């Protein structure tokens, strides 16, 4: 039987450990299992985070094994290799698909009935791999997608417009990567279209500002990696937000990456678009209105993903 308040994280690198810490702060689980090929690393992270429990929410966190996951409601997969200098994206895909081919069967043979949340990159490709390797229904396997990119987008817009980030409604969709796109046509603050709100705040050269903000969002990961070596806090908070919507059955709309079956004219790949996320998983993909230019950019993003996916299929 699934224990809705129990979760596991597979992979205790920067992202996995930061996600565990973020989940402790959220207080939505009573039990969290950390699994890593390096058992001592998982033990160390569990100890370090547990020592802060008196100042946070009560949550049992420990290093475990695949035998501990059968009753989890959620498994978060952050395990994967990082891209090395001179390595192509396809090289990275092949390495991480191989890692997933060792991880996913360990999950399925334990009778796991919960949700798989893929966070490892390239997340769109690896979500598709996890779906195919596991054989689970598509609702139960999805990825963090552009949830972080969307948070970056809203944050930067809020800074530019001097308004609370929670009052900014805007999405980044498509690939979690260079071909992602901003949905400007639907962006708004309190129902006021973003262009109109810019003028309300005294920004009349807003097209130039909007392009700069989009490029900053798209290139944020590169910039952060150049400055500090890796990104992990932001994505950890995105993971916790997704987990919260699952556990609390919020039906929150989040731009996760999941299998397309005709939506937006796409199928046979995973890509990020606004989706209702609940205890059922990626319950419903929403087809939001897009401008003609945005539709073209989404199709272009999907085409790039499909090309990589097709080259990777022999490894799945």
What does each of the following model-derived ranges do?
Residues 12-13:
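Glycine-rich Rossmann-fold phosphate-binding loop(s) that bind the pyrophosphate
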